[in-house]
Amino acid sequence: MKFQFVTALALASTMAVAAPINDQQEVLGAVAATRSKREGGSTGAELQDNNQPTAGLFGDGNSFGNQGLGGFLAATVDSLTKTIASPIKGILAPGGGSGGNGGSGGSGAAGGVGNLFSGILGGL
C-alpha cells in the first residue's frame, strides 16, 4: 500500500512539473519582445556596424567596438599605449630606415638617428 502511494505521488508530481513547461515557452515568447540581431540572420553590414572601432582620447583605440564610458576608457588606454609605444618602437627598431645605411658597412649612428626621428614623427 505504501509503495503504491509513493508511486502515485511521484507520478502526480512529475505530471504537475511537466505540465507548465509548455506554458512557460509561450510565456517566454511573449515576454521576450526584443530579438537578437543574430537570431533572425544578420547581414554583413550589420555585423560590421557592430564591430566599429572605438576612438579614444588620443585617436584610434581598441577594435572591439565597445561603447559607453567603459569602452571609451578602454580605447583611451589603448590609444595612449599606442602613442607612447610608437616612438619607442622607432628608436629601438634595428636598421637604417630613413637615416641611411652609412654605405655597405651597416646602419651605424646615422641609421639610429633616422630611427629616432622616424619613430617620433611616426607616433604623431
UniProtKB/Swiss-Prot annotation:
Induction: Up-regulated upon milbemycins A3 oxim derivative (A3Ox) treatment. Its main location: membrane. It comes from the Eukaryota. A lipid is attached at S107 (GPI-anchor amidated serine). Keywords: Cell membrane, Glycoprotein, GPI-anchor, Lipoprotein, Membrane, Signal. It is found in: Cell membrane. One of its GO terms (cellular component) is side of membrane. Residues 1-18 form the signal peptide. The keyword Signal applies. Residues 38-59 are annotated as: Disordered. Residues 108-124 form a propeptide. Coiled coil: none annotated. It is a lipid-anchor; GPI-anchor. The gene is PGA11. This is Predicted GPI-anchored protein 11.
